Amino acid sequence: MSELHLLSTQQLITGLQDKQFSSLELTDHYIKRINALDSKINSFITHTSETARTQAKAADEMRVQGDKRPLLGVPMAHKDIFCTQGVLTTCGSKMLHNFISPYDATIVTNIDKAGMISLGKLNMDEFAMGSDNESSYYGAVHNPWNIGHVPGGSSGGSAAAVAAGFVPVATGSDTGGSIRQPASFCGLTGIKPTYGRVSRFGMIAYASSLDQAGSMGRSAMDCAYLLQPMIGHDPRDATSIKYDMPDYVQDLNDAAASAGDKPFAGLRIGVAKEYFSKGLDTEVEQAARAALKKYEELGATIVEVTITDPEITLATYYMLAPAEASSNLSRFDGVRFGYRCENPKDLIDLYTRSRSEGFGPEVQRRILSGTYALSAGYFDAYYIKAQKVRRLIVKDFEDAFANCDVIASPTAPTAAYKLGEDLDPATMYLGDVYTIGVNLAGLPALSQPVGLTSAGLPIGLQLIGQYWQESKLLSTAHLFQQHTDHHLQHSTIAKETV
C-alpha cells in the first residue's frame, strides 16, 4: 500500500473495482504524501483534504451500491485557473488572493460528475503567464526530479504534483505550451486538445483565442482517462464546438489490440528542419532523434516537412497573446472583486494602485506590451499584421499535413533549468518556441517523455496532430509507450515513501 501513488490510472481503477483498496484508503495515501512532501515542491495553493475524504467515503458507498463509473473515487487536482464553487481560485496572483468563485468551471462540473475526487488547487505562473512557475504569488514550484530546477509553466504545479506522486492526473491549461512544456520538464505526458474541444467556461482567461484546457498524467492512457470527461460542447462557451465525441480510452485499447510487430506501419511522421535548428540543446536533440528512430523501427515513415520559421511564430504569438491579455485583464480593477488597494484618493488612484500592487512584474509587462500593440497608430502595424501572419502559420500547417499524419519536434529546446537563473524575458519566451505555433493554429498536440539528460532531467517529444485528432495523438504515444519505458521512470520525490 505504500506505493499506490506509483500505479497508473488504469491500475487504480482496477484496484478499486476489485476491492484491493478503497477510495478512502487511496485518498488518504495521497493526502499523507502531500502533507509530508509538498513542502519541498510547493505544488498546491489550496488543499481540500476534508472534502476529499468525505467524497471518497461517498464514492465507496456508491461503488457498493453498483455504481459502475470507471473514474469513481479516483483522486486528481485542478490547476488554480479553473473556478471552483466555494473554494479559493487565485490564478496564482495577489489580485485574486481572496477570490472564492460562486460557480464551477464546466470541466470541474464534468469531472465531478465522473466521480473523481479533487484534492485541491495547484500552483501556477501568475495568470498563466510564464514558463517556469516562478511568477506565482504563492512562491516558485520545484521540479520533483531535482528540486533545484523549475518544473516548467504555466501548469508547473500540475506537472509537479503528478510527477511527485501527489495525484495520478491533473488538469492544466495551454495558451502557448503551458501543458506540454511542464510535461516535458517533469517526465510526463500532457495533451492540449483542439481549440474548442474543451469548454473554457470558468477558466480564467489569458488569451481567449489561444487558451485551451487539457490533461496531464504519466502516460497517454492516464491523459485519455482524464480528458474523456472534460470534452464536449458547452453552450456557455461561444468558442466550444459541436463535434463527434470520441471514446479515448476505447480508442487506445483498440489501437493496442490491433497492433502487430510494426504498430506504426503506414504512419507518416513529419519532421521539420525548423524544429532542429539553432538554440536546441544537444542532449535534447539526441533524445528526440532517438525517439524518432524508435518510431521508424516500429514501422513509421519519417517525412521532411516545412513549417513557419519558429522565430516568426514566436514574434506573432508575443504580439497577439499580450494584446488579448491586456483586454481580458482589464476587468481586474479593484472595484468588483479581487485585490483592492487601501485608502485610494480617487477612482484613478484606485485603478492604478490596485493593478500595480495586485499584478506581478511579468503580468504587468505583458499587459503593457499588449496595450501598446492595440493603441492608436500601432494597431494596424502590429496587431492586424500579426493576425495576417497567424493565418499564414495555419496555412503552413495545412500544407505540411498534406504529406504526413503527425508532426514531431522536441517539446522544448532545453531540459529544466535551475530555479532563480533569472532568465531575461526574451530568453524565457524562447522556451516556448516549438509549442506556440500549435496554439496559433488551434491544433491538438501532446508531449511524451523520451529520455533523460546526463543530469537526470526529463526530455519530451512533441507530437502535433490535425484538427480533432486527439485519439490519433494519444494512440500514437500509447503504442510508443507499449515499447518503451520512459513513462515508467519516477522522480526523486515520487520514490520517497512516507
From Swiss-Prot:
SUPFAM superfamilies: Amidase signature (AS) enzymes. It is an enzyme of class 6 (ligase). Allows the formation of correctly charged Gln-tRNA(Gln) through the transamidation of misacylated Glu-tRNA(Gln) in organisms which lack glutaminyl-tRNA synthetase. The reaction takes place in the presence of glutamine and ATP through an activated gamma-phospho-Glu-tRNA(Gln). The active site is at K79, S154, S178. It catalyses: L-glutamyl-tRNA(Gln) + L-glutamine + ATP + H2O = L-glutaminyl-tRNA(Gln) + L-glutamate + ADP + phosphate + H(+). Belongs to the amidase family. GatA subfamily. Heterotrimer of A, B and C subunits. This is Glutamyl-tRNA(Gln) amidotransferase subunit A. Keywords: ATP-binding, Ligase, Nucleotide-binding, Protein biosynthesis. The keyword Transcription regulation does not apply. The lineage of its organism: Bacteria, Pseudomonadati, Pseudomonadota, Gammaproteobacteria, Moraxellales. It comes from Psychrobacter arcticus (strain DSM 17307 / VKM B-2377 / 273-4). InterPro entries: Amidase, Amidase_CS, Amidase_dom, AS_sf, GatA. PROSITE patterns: AMIDASES. GO terms for cellular component: glutamyl-tRNA(Gln) amidotransferase complex. Its EC number is 6.3.5.7. GO terms for molecular function: ATP binding; glutaminyl-tRNA synthase (glutamine-hydrolyzing) activity. One of its GO terms (biological process) is translation. The keyword Ligase applies. Gene3D superfamilies: Amidase signature (AS) domain.
